[in-house]
Amino acid sequence: MKPLEQVSIAIVHEWLGPPGGSEQVVACMLEVFPQADLYVLVHDPDRQRGTPLEQTPIRTSFIQSLPKAKERYRLYLPLMPLAVEQFDLRPYDLVISSSHAVAKGVLTRADQPHISYIHTPMRYAWELYLAYLTESRLDRGVKSWLARLVLHYLRLWDVSASNRVDVFLTTSPYVARRIQKVYRRTAQVLYPPINVDRFRHDLPREDFFLAVSRFVPYKRMKLIVEAFSETGKPLVVIGDGPEFENVRRAAKPNVQLLGHQPNGTVTDYLQRARALVFAAEEDFGNVPVEAQAAGCPVIAYGKGGVLETVTGWPASNPTGVFFSAQTTDSLQAAVQLFEDHEDLFTPEACRRNVERFGRSHFQRELRATVNEIWKNFGTGGN
């Protein structure tokens, strides 16, 4: 059997949009397996400038050439199952998919192991289905029934496609439980990579709160902006996306929206903010981990991956405060609680809490895991 260094590998991902957690995973995978070829359905090269993926050769699907696909790739979601099945991966020994939608549905040979790193089952097709319809104004009328039909089809395809995967890896125990619920499959947890070493945690804090996120409905950026607009507390918001204009209209003068910013700017703000505000129910949540690496406490909605990455007050050495409901009142109460006990949240405790999520740990564990799967598959032990 070939050693892993000589194995030909295809890495498959859905899309490369604004740099985020899944893009960091793909970049790390390519560092671990430099011989791998990268396949994505669609990507915007301009979004990858200054990132580790800027110089990476990328093979794309037919969606790449469709109108406005680079900017509004989600419009082509109904075509993505078909598109991912057109990738010809026959020449490769091993396939690794990085999937939050359809990448796990690639077609592989019987003797070709397929390892899928699942960021999440398709949230908008499963547990966020009804919320997605409401927030997208697709909860009534003819368009609503068309959207429901498409999402029904995607759920059927999604479950069917999960059977094409030999081994599931995932980001957290929280997502592993969802994979078991949706696909009836077990998944091994491998926490995603965070470049904690790029942050300093010993810089002076300044008088502003910070939110960093893509502007999509489930991130609840409008909730954060409305809560701070009501209290007048200074808030800086970094990120962009389809909800940006909707959120901007809710912002009062105490809220500063910076739009998309390069990594260096995000790092600078995380190192100076009083606290990060995070309102999403996220499967893992890279930004709260990055904030703690920068010595910045986290005020977060208390569901999902943050329960595994943030030590909530009143525990000893707390690194954050949780709020119990996605409402302005609940968030404002959490901010007040943080301010009342701010001296308890030390930069040193924040940094110590997230050392376990470093890039080197992810890369070491990924290589060992893939090597073990490769050896077992070749000997019939899968």
Feature names for model-found ranges:
Residues 326, 343-373, 378:
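A charged, aromatic-enriched C-terminal amphipathic alpha-helix characteristic of glycosyltransferases
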Residues 35-104:
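Active-site donor-binding segments of glycosyltransferases and PAPS-dependent sulfotransferases
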Residues 271-283, 296:
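Acidic donor-binding loop of glycosyltransferase active sites
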Residues 135-168, 176:
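Membrane-proximal helix-turn-helix segments that form the acceptor-binding/catalytic region
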Residues 196, 200-236:
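Conserved donor-binding/catalytic core segment of Leloir-type glycosyltransferases
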Residues 297-302, 307-310:
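Short hydrophobic beta-strand element within catalytic cores of glycosyltransferases
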Residues 245-267:
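Nucleotide-activated donor-binding/catalytic signature segment of Leloir-type glycosyltransferases, i.e.
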